[in-house]
């Protein structure tokens, strides 16, 4: 066989090997880029940004059912993950460091603390409401007007207001927190929002108000009335010092919102983050016979709307 033909075959083999090596390197680089992007997205979702949707009209018209929102999870603190990554299995969290404090009028996303007689809430149930009362504040509602520390608080500019009917003062609503009051959603309180380190005297007049919060702090039903004595964990108690900061929250559409009036206060460690922006919005109901598709179901004027 001539030498030239042997050399030509050898050169071809080398070119094929080089091509194979380059292809493998490109594949590895691509997979590495995908892996880095995945890890970055996972870190971002775990610690910084969360996406969620609005299912109800309780925050109308600030937020509408069908809005897709971004939540700043780092607005107040950085915590360890609340869930095992890529699952819905909740795990205990630990605060790593603080980045700020929730303020009145902040729109927050939080883990639902439970109904008014419920100590252990449902897992993975998140609510979105507006902070009205901060730790230590006194909140009262008179004929649908909210007062904090005796000062009238104006409604959010986009909130739905329905003045067609107001429940009279003294007409009790059995759904209202706490039990045993003559309050209703339009005439509520006054109630003091618990603050970490705040000590309250306990008596038969206020134990229904504070008992649930104390039970939740112990994560067990520890408050009891034994004859004429109030006990906590079996020991007589005339007072209690709160271990956490709490917030009183309301929906902007107050006539169609289940909020602190019905199930009590939100502890600070249940707050997920602050609502930032609407990044997408779809009408939840499209008129029958409308065949225009998704284009006309999008609320284009709400995309990139900042949440105030």
What do the PLM-derived regions correspond to, one by one?
Residues 29-47:
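Hydrophobic membrane-insertion alpha-helices, especially the h-region
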Residues 2-26, 62-308:
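Soluble "head" domains of membrane/secretory-pathway proteins
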Residues 50-67:
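Alpha-helical transmembrane signal-anchor/signal-peptide segments
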């Amino acid at each position: 066989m001539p030498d030239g033909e042997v050399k030509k075959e050898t050169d071809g083999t080398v070119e094929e090997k080089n091509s194979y090596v380059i292809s493998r390197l490109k594949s590895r680089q691509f997979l590495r880029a995908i892996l880095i992007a995945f890890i970055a997205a996972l870190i971002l979702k775990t610690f910084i940004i969360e996406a969620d949707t609005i299912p109800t009209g309780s925050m109308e018209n600030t937020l509408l059912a069908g809005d897709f929102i971004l939540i700043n999870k780092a607005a107040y603190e950085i915590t360890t993950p609340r869930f095992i990554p890529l699952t819905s299995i909740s795990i205990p969290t630990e605060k790593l460091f603080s980045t700020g404090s929730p303020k009145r009028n902040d729109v927050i996303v939080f883990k639902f603390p439970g109904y008014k007689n419920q100590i252990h809430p449902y897992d993975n149930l998140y609510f979105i409401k507006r902070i009205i009362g901060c730790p230590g504040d006194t909140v009262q509602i008179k004929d649908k007007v909210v007062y904090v520390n005796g000062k009238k608080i104006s409604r959010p500019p986009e909130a739905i207001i329905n003045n067609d009917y107001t429940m009279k003062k003294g007409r009790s609503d059995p759904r209202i927190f706490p039990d045993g009051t003559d309050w209703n959603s339009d005439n509520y309180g006054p109630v003091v929002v618990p603050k970490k380190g705040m000590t309250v005297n306990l008596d038969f007049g206020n134990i229904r108000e504070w008992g649930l919060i104390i039970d939740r702090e112990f994560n067990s039903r520890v408050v009891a009335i034994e004859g004429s004595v109030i006990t906590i964990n079996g020991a007589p108690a005339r007072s209690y010092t709160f271990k956490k900061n709490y917030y009183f929250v309301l929906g902007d559409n107050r006539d169609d919102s289940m909020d602190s009036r019905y199930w009590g206060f939100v502890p600070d460690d249940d707050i997920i983050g602050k609502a930032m922006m609407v990044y997408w919005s779809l009408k939840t109901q499209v008129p029958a016979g409308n065949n225009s598709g998704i284009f006309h179901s999008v609320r284009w004027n709400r995309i990139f709307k900042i949440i105030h």
